[in-house]
Amino acid sequence: MKKRFPTLLATLIWTALYSQHTLADLAEQCMLGVPTYDQPLVTGDPNQLPVRINADKTEANYPDNALFTGNVIVQQGNSTLTANQVELTQVQKPGEVIPLRTVTATGDVNYDDPQIKLKGPKGWSNLNTKDTDMDKGKYQMVGRQGRGDADLMKLRDQSRYTILKNGTFTSCLPGDNSWSVVGSEVIHDREEQVVEVWNARFKIGKVPVFYSPYMQLPVGDKRRSGFLIPNAKFTSNNGFEFLLPYYWNIAPNFDATITPHYMERRGLQWQNEFRYLLAPGSGTMALDWLPNDRIYTGPDGTDKNATRWLYYWGHSGVMDQVWRFNINYTRVSDPAYFTDLTSQYGSTTDGYATQIFTAGYANENWNATLSSKQFQVFTAAGNSNAYRAQPQLDMNYYKNDVGPFDMHVYGQAAKFTSVNPTNPEASRFHIEPTVNLPLSNSWGSINTEAKLLATHYQQDIPASFADNASNPKLKDSVNRVLPQFKVDGKVVFDRSMDWATGFTQTLEPRAQYLYVPYRNQDDIYIYDTTLMQSDYSGLFRDRTYSGLDRIASANQVSTGLTSRIYDDARVERFNVSVGQIYYFSRSRTGNTEAIDNSNATGSLVWAGDTFWRINDQLGLKGGAQYDTRLGSLTLGNAIMEYRKDADRMIQLNYRYASPKYIQAAVPKVYNPDYQQGISQVGTTASWPIADRWAIVGAYYYDTKAKQPASQLVGLQYNTCCWAVNLGYERKITGWNAQGQTSKYDNKIGFNIELRGLSGGHSLGTAQMLNSGILPYQSAF
């Protein structure tokens, strides 16, 4: 099966590419069956507009009534009534300026206005209020999907309300009764964009499958409390699944969605989402709760019927133009949560959940941010060594135009604690004054910078840690002071291209010298520091490591050259960059990692990036980094993508990370798979293969491990009022240490979706592609 899967995917893509079937846009197809109001709109008070009547025969008793027979047409403003016979009655009530005018129509009665069309054997209408009744008739909305029939239909409040007695509603086009909602009373409110149904029976074809004493269906995008579109699917992991979201419009600045999510194999999960808008900003809180999961038995396999949950809080806002508040907090009950359960707030590939709170104040020349940072790592080893920064205070002060100089002072104070009581903890204080001398004109710039990096650590070292000979020898109190000097200059040349009219090419050389003296930092533990990726832009960074625990020495020159091509609309069509770092002396911090323990000098780090947008549909992008200290190509990636539109796309990609780079960047990683390095080739595609049919596929193969990393194929059929998709996914979910093999999860999914209630008519390819463990990302 493993060998056949790429062949199957390639065959499907080949079939799609060479299909000669001409596809019309689904939205256009659906709107062909929806009536439109194509008459000029009449403005003004309808009661003041004249009534025009045409008929083959007329009998009148002026001014009380008149009888019209034969091809009768009654028009007033934007409303038109046609019938075989119409009786017009006019009654002048005492004290009323305008007489009450009504019409009673019989025989093939049709009524239409810009909102709705009605048809039935008998009808009545109040020409003053536009209230209209129709016996045993049919209706269809104008300009949007929605139709049905009823024993009695009423239009009220200038056609805002359609009231049905023993009526039906469906978004399917005429001639298609795939699904419908039947109720003893149905009220469609066009202003609030909702359909309310009492004694509702949901039917597939002619078969009732669901009953509710009351139901609401949204028929637009306006906020209103009520049940949203239900969703049903089947997966091999969870069995049959059914979701019935309820939207609660609490207030203009508060709303919530409560979704009971039934999973045949696991039980009933409650998905709750609350949204708010306040003076300090807007945010979302979510709580997913699954009591007594019938499959999951806990990390150690002994906790039967475990309760599983997710909590999320996201917030962003500015208050009084100076205060800033941001929250990105996610916590789950167990490391396997995102592997077993689908959530928009995280995925298996994240590896951890972020828990960050920040509050900041910004003024003209300074700002301060107080934060709390923590991470829930989804591996036992990673979580036991995770650190919290609680609290962390960052401050910046800016003073520009001090003569020719710009000044900046950065300061930080942080308290680091570990979830593992045997790990060291620390308080860190850092100050970083900087002086810049920027010079620039229209074609170039040069910036000279000098700064001082002063850091103090007060470390709390447990006795068990200090007594372990394999651990680094730390000091309780450490002071580290480092000066830094940098000169960075770049020039931009441009010229018109002879062989492409209107095109412009640039040549942008750049050079930077950086000096930081060496300080041995073996006596400082690593709390928030990792090796940063050395792409082309990274060649011109000040730091090799993120955070402050390691500041590598530097006596180096970084040089680079970028060339860009712009078309006549100033859209960038091509660029290529290549650069290097030349080391006059080895860069080190004092630790014993491979990248820091090399004595090599000279041109050690090379990096290049390129992008080529061949046309509006086809593009290429890639990059590579080489580090002679590790003796290998460290990172590489390449993407080629053809994207005709949102539903027609083919992407080929490759990504590489060397084993030595991974060990240098994440030295404590345990998984042997990752220690081999990463070398993955993949393809992602989506394409309509026939009228209303669309297929997606994704396949990633790890050439190092010689095994598939992810496989996904999905097939969707779309109509104007429903869609169904069938998908298969096989993904790595973990590592079997005992058998030294990857753990796989195979999932087959079947999903049904009701359509036509809102404006969306996509083929569903984006949703299927984003459901995979490696979601699709556009190359350009």
Swiss-Prot record:
The signal peptide here is 1-24
Task: Tell me, in one coarse class, where this protein mainly resides.
Answer: membrane
One Pfam match, given by its short name, reads LptD_N
Q: Which keywords does this chain's UniProt record carry?
A: Cell outer membrane, Membrane, Signal
Pull one GO CC term from this UniProt entry.
Answer: cell outer membrane
Q: Share an example GO biological-process annotation for this protein.
A: Gram-negative-bacterium-type cell outer membrane assembly
Q: Is Membrane one of the keywords UniProt gives this record?
A: yes
> Can you say what this protein is called?
LPS-assembly protein LptD
Native source organism of the sequence: Yersinia pestis
